[in-house]
């Protein structure tokens, strides 16, 4: 990428980030509310041992949070410790985390140079599908990680948990890295699979025959 193109991309990226951040900041609550069924389904799929009593979006001390209330659906054993059916807890995480994926992914896509309108439009559609995938592996895992962390802190401190490890990965920079990686893959596909225009296929050049002397 040439320096002039790089500067143009950086400027467009700043403008795209400002615009998408403003839009999603206004739509934070309805956006996260719309994702609640996805979050609930993911929690049920990843942790069938829990019964989800409630998964809500709430305001707490001026911040919007996603709150999960679960209890054990049956008697369970965790690292040799018996946990009775009905034992539960409530955890929460910031709803604003859900905004990072669409803001980063869409901003990079909208700012990237060299994409025509058609490819950029298809890219936005694909980006929205990727956002759903990223969302399914963010807040639900944050909430489950908090649940597992709280349980392990009581019954088996220091024990490893996949949900806790993923939660820490997201908090340690993974939440920003995932949409950037998704944007890179999507842009690579859009660039390498550019649709050919009809009527512009390359044709072999035919040189006129020289007259015999």
Predicted regions located by residue number:
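Primarily interfacial, aromatic-capped hydrophobic alpha-helices that serve as membrane anchors
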Residues: 158-208, 212-213
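N-terminal signal-anchor transmembrane alpha helix
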Residues: 7-55
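Alpha-helical transmembrane segments and their helix-start/interface "positive-inside/aromatic belt" motifs
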Residues: 3-18, 118-129
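Hydrophobic alpha-helical membrane-insertion segments
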Residues: 18-29, 125-142
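Individual transmembrane alpha-helix segments
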Residues: 63-108
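Mid-length scaffold segments of soluble, non-membrane domains
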Residues: 100-133
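Juxtamembrane non-transmembrane "cap" segments at the membrane-aqueous interface
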Residues: 136-157
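Structural signal for the C-terminal ends of transmembrane alpha-helices
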Residues: 26-27, 109-117, 187-196
